[in-house]
């Protein structure tokens, strides 16, 4: 509907949603791609983000800014996850992305995909033992009620594209476009601030009201997770090239440049 411009003219969706029709948007979800939220900001506001905006242009969408969904943190009902060994055969609901499924396979998990609307019941009944999502999404679905363990591993990041239908944008005067773009820039910056400000409150509430065990990044064997997915960038590049995306190597290299602290 956003592409057609009727009835939706402006929308905000994650890179995972857009990856359903163009797998190049999965590049944002490469494991341990971003060392920090500052690194994510620098890349998505810079050359890497411009490449994604150019891809959106191919579909008739003008991106006014890139906001944040956040790092996808891991929750489960079995045990505290500190290292890749703790992931073995853990039944985890994973978002519908071939890249994410490949990563969880390499981490040793028993990954499955299901609709998010069905996930709470599946977790409650222990049909699946865990899931991965940014904290606000987990909290909004009350998943903490049935998931006593949360690992803050910052493995995979989600962004949000704030887009307007390209034809509508092109019909505006240059002055109007300038206003739209500035509003988009300010809105996405503000959204990032709000999103990040809520994480500490969410974790404190989960611990105090739900008894959730929070395992912090610095208490985890992050290297064990990184080693398990070593080479997944090359796997992803071959996947893209196999589907005819000749810009795959350049796109990935733009995102995997040295981190900005």
What residue ranges belong to the model's regions?
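N-terminal secretory/targeting leader peptides
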Residues: 1-39, 48, 56-261
């Amino acid at each position: 509907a956003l592409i057609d411009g009727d009835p939706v003219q402006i929308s905000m969706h994650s890179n995972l949603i857009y990856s359903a029709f163009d797998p190049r948007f999965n590049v944002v979800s490469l494991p341990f791609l971003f060392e920090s939220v500052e690194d994510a900001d620098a890349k998505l506001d810079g050359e890497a983000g411009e490449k994604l905006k150019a891809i959106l242009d191919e579909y008739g969408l003008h991106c006014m800014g890139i906001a944040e969904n956040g790092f996808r943190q891991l929750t489960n009902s079995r045990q505290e996850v500190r290292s890749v060994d703790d992931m073995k055969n853990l039944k985890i609901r994973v978002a519908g992305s071939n890249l994410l499924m490949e990563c969880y396979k390499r981490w040793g998990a028993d990954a499955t995909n299901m609709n998010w609307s069905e996930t709470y019941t599946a977790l409650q009944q222990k049909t699946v033992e865990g899931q991965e999502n940014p904290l606000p999404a987990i909290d909004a679905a009350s998943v903490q009620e049935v998931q006593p363990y949360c690992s803050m591993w910052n493995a995979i990041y989600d962004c949000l594209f704030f887009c307007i239908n390209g034809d509508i944008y092109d019909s505006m005067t240059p002055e109007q476009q300038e206003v739209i773009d500035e509003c988009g820039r300010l809105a996405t910056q503000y959204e990032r601030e709000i999103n990040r400000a809520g994480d500490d409150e969410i974790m404190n509430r989960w611990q105090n009201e739900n008894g959730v065990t929070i395992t912090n990044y610095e208490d985890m064997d992050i290297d064990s997770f990184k080693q398990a997915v070593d080479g997944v960038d090359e796997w992803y590049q071959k996947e893209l090239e196999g589907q005819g995306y000749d810009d795959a190597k350049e796109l990935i290299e733009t995102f995997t440049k040295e981190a900005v602290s």
